[in-house]
Amino acid sequence: LLCLSLGLLGFAGCNEHSASPSTPVEAAIAAGEIGSRMPDFSVKDLPGRQVTTEELRGKVVLIDFWATWCEPCKREMPGYQQLLDRYGPQGFVVIGFKFDTMKDTEDPMRFAKRLGIHYPLAVATEAVKQKFGGIEGLPTTMVYDRKGILREKIIGFEYTEAVERALKPLL
């Protein structure tokens, strides 16, 4: 009886037609989840230069969602600049998306200068936040590989060394 049951289970699983059409794995994964594709975006950074997904193709990309009032963000950002200084020549880039809230009391350009940040910083509009799957907390860091696939997502503070360990295999 056991052999018959196992045989029927095996036979039932041999259907030639799948229940749903096949889709690329990345397309089936929700935005902002590990394995999802980097969303298409085109934004102006704080000085007014256009930053697009197109110019990031073929690079390892760290996306950082931050705010001027966020203490963990202030601790992380200089480390991301150090990683950019170290790995930029190998095709690594950092883009910072600033949350625009009533808590902001410091000019973001002065804030970046004070922290020694030279990578592009743009405002995280609601549309941008949604394209990245919604942002659950600050800081939120996302690391995409050269094919634009999300390989690491960190919500909250993380030491630069841990981010670097996740980053190095992608370079």
Predicted regions and their residues:
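N-terminal targeting signals for export/organelle localization
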Residues: 1-40, 152-153, 163-166
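Short active-site neighborhood of thiol/selenol oxidoreductases, capturing the structured segment around
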Residues: 52-71, 94
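Short, conserved catalytic or interaction motifs in soluble domains
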Residues: 13-16, 75, 99, 146
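Loop/turn elements at helix/coil->beta-strand transitions in domains of secreted/extracellular proteins
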Residues: 58-61, 90-93, 117-119, 146
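A short beta-strand-turn-helix
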Residues: 33-35, 40-61, 84-87, 130-132
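Thiol/disulfide oxidoreductase modules built on the thioredoxin-like
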Residues: 110-118, 123-168
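Structural microenvironment flanking redox-active thiols in thiol-disulfide oxidoreductases
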Residues: 74-115, 124-131
